[in-house]
């Protein structure tokens, strides 16, 4: 997987940007209008989703209109002076921010300052031409983003989800090593946990991208089920990572386990690691027995704390109780993941049977 990523230099968005620029130049040359502003607009209008291209395009057009108007106004009154550049940029930024045209502020400002040195007269004509070039760049880029290599993130999301299962298991294994040694977790484990969170946020962002364009493209029922599966998996993995983060912050060095308690906890976490690496497709009976033992430990610890007097103990949970609670919570998420997978597999089997009957 890493090797494929390493050599995947040119992605779909880069290709679409090149196509959009090429077509924009052709259109501008056909109508004999300047290309540079249209090309700038075309480049920035290519977004991760077609929906964003349309929405931000509708923002960038009025923003560029504002920038062009300020540029021509200050050039008319002040000429090609440094003050013209400064005032055009400042007024464009302030106006765009006040009108909440945030997505178009950069393009509008670039348009404003770039128009000044190339306009000597016929200011109103130059203003209209700039509207035409901006419109050309926005329209061409939006059409390209919509019809050419339309964004599909389902495979990317699935890849991220598989990676999350593996890396979550690896972090759990690193934490278990620290627990068994009775030491604070290593900096490397903390770093891996932060990378895990970044990967999760990246996957969630891809889900949001896919949802935005969902209404614009056709999908088979199988693709829809697959997308819903990974969406639910990511939601539960997010909760698992949250509980692992709590485990990483738990005071391991203050724990006082008996040998039997420590062994049951070790075996349970090993079982959780194995289930995660298997994408929660199967949970055996031995795992449920270990969870029952762990559950008994948790309630025993909690009941023991109930007899403590306030001046002897100032916390509602001991270190052991916190760890047991987080591990049991992770198990609950694993059960939900297994149920989701079984439901998905069952629907696929029903579909296959219906196809065979037909």
UniProtKB/Swiss-Prot annotation:
This is UPF0421 protein BT9727_2513. Belongs to the UPF0421 family. The keyword Cell membrane applies. It is found in: Cell membrane. One of its GO terms (cellular component) is plasma membrane. Keywords: Cell membrane, Membrane, Transmembrane, Transmembrane helix. It is a multi-pass membrane protein. The chain crosses the membrane at residues 19-39, 74-94, 109-129, 131-151. It holds the Pfam family ArAE_1.
């Amino acid at each position: 997987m890493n090797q494929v990523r390493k050599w995947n230099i040119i992605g779909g968005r880069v290709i679409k940007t090149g196509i959009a620029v090429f077509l924009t130049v052709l259109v501008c040359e056909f109508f004999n209008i300047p290309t540079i502003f249209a090309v700038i607009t075309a480049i920035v209008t290519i977004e991760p989703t077609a929906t964003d291209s349309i929405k931000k395009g509708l923002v960038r057009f009025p923003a560029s209109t504002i920038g062009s108007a300020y540029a021509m106004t200050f050039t008319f009154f002040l000429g090609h002076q440094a003050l013209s550049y400064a005032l055009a940029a400042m007024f464009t930024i302030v106006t765009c921010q006040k009108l909440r045209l945030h997505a178009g502020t950069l393009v509008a400002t670039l348009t404003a300052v770039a128009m000044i040195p190339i306009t000597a007269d016929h200011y109103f004509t130059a203003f209209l031409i700039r509207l035409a070039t901006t419109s050309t760049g926005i329209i061409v880029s939006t059409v390209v983003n919509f019809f050419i290599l339309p964004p599909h993130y389902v495979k990317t999301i699935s890849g991220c989800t598989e990676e999350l299962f593996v890396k979550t298991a690896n972090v759990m294994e690193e934490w278990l090593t620290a627990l068994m040694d009775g030491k604070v977790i290593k900096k490397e484990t903390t770093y891996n946990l932060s990378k895990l969170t970044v990967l999760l946020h990246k996957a969630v962002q891809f889900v949001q991208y896919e949802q935005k364009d969902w209404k614009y493209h056709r999908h088979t029922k199988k693709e829809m089920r697959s997308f819903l599966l990974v969406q639910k998996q990511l939601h539960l993995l997010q909760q698992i990572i949250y509980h692992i983060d709590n485990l990483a912050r738990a005071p391991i060095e203050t724990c006082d386990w008996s040998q039997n308690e420590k062994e049951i906890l070790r075996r349970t976490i090993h079982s959780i690691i194995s289930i995660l690496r298997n994408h929660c497709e199967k949970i055996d009976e031995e795992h449920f027995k270990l969870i029952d033992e762990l559950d008994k430990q948790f309630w025993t610890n909690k009941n023991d704390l109930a007899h403590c007097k306030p001046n002897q103990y100032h916390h509602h949970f001991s270190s052991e109780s916190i760890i047991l609670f987080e591990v049991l919570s992770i198990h609950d998420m694993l059960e939900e993941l297994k149920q989701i997978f079984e439901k998905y597999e069952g629907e696929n089997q029903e579909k296959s049977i219906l196809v065979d009957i037909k």
